[in-house]
């Protein structure tokens, strides 16, 4: 598995809320090939985006979708950077899938 983590600093809390809303609505179709997508608010103006793919090639193919998202939220953003690499470890508790914030897709 291959993981890409984006960290985004927004111009305001409202900008972050708008960008996260756009991501929730579009990420599954934009990040083609993603096996797992997660966002985390790291402050009132920043968020971390995690995307897990089967391979580095799948992650690279999804860069088109990442660019679409960056283009859409461009005026909302102060700074963006990302890290990526092979997944070393993952654990998923069976109760996790029942959490209210989880959206199951196909």
Question: Over which residues does each language-model region extend?
Answer:
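Short S/T/G/P-rich N-terminal loop/turn motif that feeds into the first structured element of a domain
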Residues: 1-48, 54-68, 75-106
């Amino acid at each position: 598995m291959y993981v890409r983590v984006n960290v985004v600093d927004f111009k305001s809390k409202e900008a972050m809320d708008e960008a996260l809303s756009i991501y929730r609505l579009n990420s599954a179709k934009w990040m083609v090939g993603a096996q797992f997508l997660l966002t985390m608010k790291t402050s009132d103006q920043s968020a971390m985006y995690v995307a897990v793919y089967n391979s580095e090639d799948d992650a690279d193919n999804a860069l088109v979708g990442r660019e679409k998202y960056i283009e859409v939220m461009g005026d909302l953003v102060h700074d963006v950077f990302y890290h990526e690499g092979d997944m070393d470890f993952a654990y998923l508790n069976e109760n996790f899938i029942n959490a209210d914030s989880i959206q199951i897709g196909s």
